[in-house]
């Protein structure tokens, strides 16, 4: 994928860029793999905002992605198309299996139309193939990794992300996450070889607020410019620093978002670096 820069014909176009979608081979999705998607604007069933800064945006249809890939072992599939997916940063690949079934997967870097992919313990180590961690050599770059056997891919799904398999010991494999964290995962968990494609997506300059609104993202207002009734940092005469350490709108200190007593914490070998405050 390459980035195409706009000419500065207006303030919103100056510096803005967009993907050239050179990897995408089809514009309309596979009808049998599309489901309706209803936006909720960050509201729950009572109509109250539970997730701020969401709402509006272009109408989308959900593409059903196969995150498990555990029921087609030994059945080869041909990459029919690389498609755009409005619901994620990565592109998706439409697979045509030899038995006639069609499925979507996350498109890895280097996968192109006409390639053949497979899944199962005996699959080759090449981008797009899906195997259990016990069958993948140490040092391999992988993505779409499960946290529990058969639970479906949970890790490294966004554009350009990848995980490195450092080694295996007993029933666990050690993985280096995109954050730098080193974590142990059951060797029965599956992963797909290669890194997620569309890595240049991170370099797109959106140019104007309106393009964010098309994506369903609303403005994020700083607490220091609010009134005291709306935020702990609000109020004061003139510009103020907030008068206290940074907190959320509900008074919780910023940072430290992880649950301290999570059962899976014992599988973390080395924590991610989180800066001077919390990285000690």
Swiss-Prot record:
Region span, Disordered: 1-58, 226-280
Q: What's any one GO cellular component for it? A: large ribosomal subunit
What Gene3D superfamilies does the record point to?
2.30.30.30, Nucleic acid-binding proteins, Ribosomal protein L2, domain 3
Ranges of compositional bias, category Basic residues: 37-58, 268-280
Molecular functions (GO terms): rRNA binding; structural constituent of ribosome; transferase activity
Ranges annotated as spanning the membrane: none
Q: Which UniProt keywords apply?
A: Ribonucleoprotein, Ribosomal protein, RNA-binding, rRNA-binding
Q: Which InterPro entries does the protein's record reference?
A: NA-bd_OB-fold, Rib_uL2_dom2, Ribosomal_uL2, Ribosomal_uL2_bac/org-type, Ribosomal_uL2_C, Ribosomal_uL2_CS, Ribosomal_uL2_dom3, Ribosomal_uL2_RNA-bd_dom
GO process terms (BP): cytoplasmic translation
- Record-stated family: Belongs to the universal ribosomal protein uL2 family.
Q: What does this protein do?
A: One of the primary rRNA binding proteins. Required for association of the 30S and 50S subunits to form the 70S ribosome, for tRNA binding and peptide bond formation. It has been suggested to have peptidyltransferase activity; this is somewhat controversial. Makes several contacts with the 16S rRNA in the 70S ribosome.
Q: What PANTHER family does the annotation carry?
A: LARGE RIBOSOMAL SUBUNIT PROTEIN UL2M (PTHR13691:SF5), RIBOSOMAL PROTEIN L2 (PTHR13691)
Q: How does it assemble?
A: Part of the 50S ribosomal subunit. Forms a bridge to the 30S subunit in the 70S ribosome.
Protein name, UniProt field: Large ribosomal subunit protein uL2
What organism does the UniProt record list as the source?
Mycolicibacterium paratuberculosis (strain ATCC BAA-968 / K-10) (Mycobacterium paratuberculosis)
